[in-house]
Amino acid sequence: MRPLVSALCAFALLPAFAGVAGLDAVSRGADPTGQRDSAAVMQKALDELNRAGGGTLYLPPGKYRLEKPLYVEGGNSIRGAGSSAANWPANRPTILCVAFGRGDTNLVKNAAVKLRGGASLRDVAIWHPDQRFEDPVPYPASIWGDGHTSVVDVTLVNSWCGFYNNHCSSMLVRGFRGTALNMGIRAAYAFDVPRIEHVAFDPAYWAASGLPGSPKTPSAVRKLEMWAENNLIAIVAGEQDWGYWWDVFVDHAKGGIFLTVVPDDKGERMNPGNIAAGKVVMRNVQVGIEMKNVGYPGFLLTYGDIQARLCCMHYSKVPDYSKFHAVGIKPYYSWNAAVQVTGVKFSGAKTLFRSDKDKDGLIYCINFNDCTFSDWKDCAISQLRGSLVASNCRFSGKGAIHPGENLSQIVLSGNMFSGEAFAVKPSASTVVARDDREKGVVSLPYDIPEPKEREFKGKVFDVLDYGATPGKVDDIPVKDSSPAFAAALAAAGKAGGGTVFAPAGVYRIARGIKVPSGVELRGSFEAQHYGNSTHRGTQLYVYAGKGDPASAPLITLEPDAGVGGFTVYYPEQGVTDDSSADEALRVKRYPPTLRTAPRCQVRNMAIVNAWTAIDAITVRSDGLFVTDVTGGALDAGVIVGHGTTGGLFRDVHFNYTGWVGQGKYENHPRGDDWDKTTTCGMFADFTTRVTRGFVLCDAKEVKLHSCFCIMVAEGISLEKDPYTGGSFRGSTWGLAFDANTNGIVGHRGAEPKFVANCAMGVFSRQQGGYFVKTEPGFAGAIASVNSEIWSGRSRIVYLEGGRTILSQFLSWCCYEGVVKKGASLTVCGATFASNNGNDKGEKTTITYERGSSGAVCGSVDGRRFLKVVDETGGKLAWRNNGVRID
């Protein structure tokens, strides 16, 4: 029987930018003029999609009046025709007109659009027509989310609160821009990895809309700006573990970013987060970044320009949490969480950076590298306690640094001061190391343009019209649908391009399929999703190639082809390489899930338990674009090389919870992942011995941006290319390695030049591993800038070859770095937070063995426990550091 979604897919011939919609809202009775309430008919359509297994409700250009909330379940999406509300109605966007909630201070209960895990909202604008710029009043949040939600290319015309998610898991907020009046984003209790990308908050969005009631005169616009400058906090963040934010712009706000703790939904805990942000620009704010409570190991900020009136960055004093203690909630506070800043311009404020964090025993560190401080009123930096590191910074003004009398250490390397460095003389107890000629601390620029996803033009070919048979998770089809997919793809290729659409459902795939040039193979998902966030949507159950990894990949992309919108699952995959285990439990080798080609596009895929997920090395794949891919592989997540030049892997996120956490998958691993008698423990043991997250061979100008892998043996594997003999040349931002054995591994014969900006890592498996590890015969260079590692089992480096640079490196209770004969390590502008297991400086920070070389400069241990053992016989340079112990 033909599923409901496809039976209604006459609307699949919508414009390509609409996606391949299951239902068209206007055809179902929605009013695009905004005169009548459309909420009821839109909700009915969403419910139909949900019953059919998932899909997209498309909103053509127009205004849609909502008189009650919309609920979007997992596996479903709302997608409009465009979100830009500027110069309405000339550009014909899709606008949701929220006609309820005026004066309602409850942000959650009646939020306009409510997204469940695995749901998405994209390409719409949201407008509250009864809001008044002269005297704004509260409204519920424009968007509420719960769990793995995606909000993409959404414009806020005049929201009180734009997006609220207090259980935001691996949320994605991208292309989220507009006017917010009280809060732009409020997100907490997120784990591995919440992402906020390409967001902007500015009163100009409302003013530029031209919508009724918008401010139109300069005085009216200025009134709105003044409101924002006294009321708006653009981003409020509670616990966001491994949060990665990129390209944040704020103009006119009381505060740009507020890092704090908030209660969870049950009122049982209040935890902070460890967040890394990059490319942050702020104008006309009172305080740029307010750090009320920062989770360990700290907050990383890379690249930006912050202009403020009171303070560009403020690390506030320890909050008074007594009212929470009185009701049994114990907010967590990290006493030694660091703040590290690279490549940021600060200007205009009374004090540019201020730390009021003051209590006996504090060992935190503030660390600046390649920053510019100018136009301050009182001083550039004021810090009461802890340690201060500043390298390669430029200070334009008098009395740049105001040291508190209890400041422990100040390390200044390679800075330029136009006036006196200190506003007051450091106290006698403060250790000061200063060398303005020391230029050994490295800073490397990084940027990526905002990439645009390609939409494939042409006819839509429905695989059901070619005989595909969809089933359900609990009713897997017997019939192989790969011939139907192949026939639809061949027809699209013959037509010169188009989209081959597979509606929601489970499809048995027993043979590999090829996607012709100019064609995209599409499932029902419109945004990033995870295997454990929903069992709905289009799922490919793979029975092809078991035991034959050299056979045809599941999906082979030809040049200029694309694939997206699927969950891919291997029902016969196992968890262990133990030969004595039952056959069903033993790991199976398969051909790659995806094989790429030049200029291909891969998006919105969850690849749950592949052998190799993405093969970008068999065919040179210049200019490939891979975005929003999640899941996990057992051999390698991504392999790229063969001379590939140019390309981007964005938000590629390998986390086995997509398999482990999805109870609908019959063979999902179960139990404690530390207990090897359970299938989950067997699986974790296998992946942390065998699996490589990203294998980088001969590729140049290929960037990895905000990518993550958990529980693998090697996060980044730098290898000699088997086709060309060459090695990787490129940079990354936002690499995260969680519970890995090792982070970056340089293998014998490889000669890469690899740069990791703003990486985070925990290396706790297989008795603990290293952030960087190199083999004998490795002849390349590895550089890390403003990165952090933590966890008691994690160690710093184990180097047997090549050159490694750790610049502005934050090691939080991690020690025991080893540099062997033939290897070189430079540690510069680094921060070490001795804590767990090293309360008296017992552990060695780094040992340079005989035959090794390197340098340590401009670095500090917050507890004065910098313990570097030099066995090189004069080949280790020691320059301008904090206190060193023997």
Regions found by a protein language model. Name each.
Residues 47-50, 112, 117-128, 131-158, 160-162, 169-226, 230-233, ...:
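Right-handed parallel beta-helix
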Residues 64, 107, 135-137, 157, ...:
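Residues that act as N-cap/strand-start positions at coil-to-secondary-structure junctions
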Residues 46-50, 65-74, 111, 115, ...:
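Short, T/G/N/S-enriched strand-turn elements that build extracellular solenoid repeat scaffolds
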Residues 107, 325, 353, 547-548, ...:
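Short beta-alpha connecting loops at secondary-structure transitions
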Residues 1-134, 150-152, 197-226, 367-369, ...:
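Extracellular "leader-to-stem" segments immediately downstream of a signal peptide or signal-anchor
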Residues 789, 797, 848, 858, ...:
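Parallel beta-helix/beta-solenoid repeats that form elongated, surface-exposed shafts/blades used
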Residues 35-38, 138, 166, 474-479, ...:
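Short, solvent-exposed loop/turn segments at secondary-structure boundaries
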